[in-house]
């Protein structure tokens, strides 16, 4: 098995989002995808930003500039009917691609304020609501399709009316956002608590606290290869105790974190956790976290 193969993932991994290269799959990659879904039961999702209609799903020959792309999808600025029709076309293209490769759903990376791209769709609250109202008919718990719809990133910007459209809310609870990590970088139980409280306060009018909590997943940034091999960064308990990184790095801390409300969280995970594939043993800290969160019954 090579590090890039899905079958190399830890056995008990419930869900993985593919950030790049998730379309135009070779026969070998299709077989690998089927194998991990069928033999390990792992849900495999496509992942995309939605800064503008067509993001991630525009044919290359039309993705040359904004005007050509918008003409392809039928987007016309300030024309509500045209915009909604273009959104319908975009949602259908996403769904068609997911069904073509039999992915298990879509993970929307929703970062309107921090993704560095000026987006006509994701930076307009009304347009986001329109698009999610359309997309939820194809994917997610409202669609009866059996396909998942999850969202990660700036969860506090997700329209309240759309909260029930998602199977999971993935918090980017990163110790570091990018660049060279500081030697003291870390995360804490209290930060996880506040992230959960934030979305409970936002979505509490349309979902129960238990429903929100059980859909909430916390994730660490494993982009720094050396830190991925060490299981992340420092982890601090609610009482202020900073644990020994060699014993409980942040990835393991997130796995162990239990919400104070007594409800079960959705889970834990990592961005670019594939950097841990070369660990000894492979995915050492991810496996340790899975075992800590869901102890095996002997």
List PLM regions with ranges.
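Secreted glycan hydrolases and related glycan-binding modules that recognize and/or cleave
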Residues: 1-298
């Amino acid at each position: 098995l090579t590090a890039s193969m899905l079958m190399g993932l830890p056995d008990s991994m419930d869900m993985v989002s593919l950030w790049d290269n998730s379309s135009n799959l070779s026969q070998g990659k299709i077989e690998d995808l089927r194998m991990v879904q069928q033999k390990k039961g792992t849900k495999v999702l496509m992942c995309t930003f939605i800064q503008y209609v067509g993001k991630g799903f525009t044919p290359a020959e039309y993705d040359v500039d904004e005007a050509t792309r918008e003409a392809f999808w039928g987007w016309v600025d300030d024309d509500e009917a045209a915009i909604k029709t273009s959104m319908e076309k975009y949602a259908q293209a996403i769904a068609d691609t997911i069904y073509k490769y039999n992915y298990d759903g879509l993970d929307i990376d929703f970062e309107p304020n921090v993704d560095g791209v000026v987006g006509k769709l994701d930076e307009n609250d009304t347009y986001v609501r329109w698009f999610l109202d359309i997309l939820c008919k194809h994917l997610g718990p409202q669609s009866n399709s059996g396909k998942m719809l999850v969202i990660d990133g700036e969860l506090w910007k997700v329209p309240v009316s759309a909260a029930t459209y998602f199977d999971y809310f993935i918090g980017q609870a990163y110790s570091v956002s990018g660049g060279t990590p500081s030697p003291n970088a870390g995360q804490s139980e209290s930060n996880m608590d506040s992230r959960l409280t934030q979305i409970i306060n936002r979505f509490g009018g349309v979902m129960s606290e238990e429903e929100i909590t059980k859909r909430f997943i916390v994730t660490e940034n494993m982009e720094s290869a050396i830190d991925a091999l060490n299981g992340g960064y420092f982890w601090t308990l609610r009482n202020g105790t900073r644990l020994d990184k060699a014993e409980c790095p942040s990835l393991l801390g997130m796995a162990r974190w239990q919400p104070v409300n007594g409800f079960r969280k959705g889970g834990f995970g990592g961005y670019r956790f594939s950097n841990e594939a070369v660990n000894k043993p492979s995915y050492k800290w991810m496996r340790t976290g899975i075992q800590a969160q869901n102890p095996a019954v002997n």
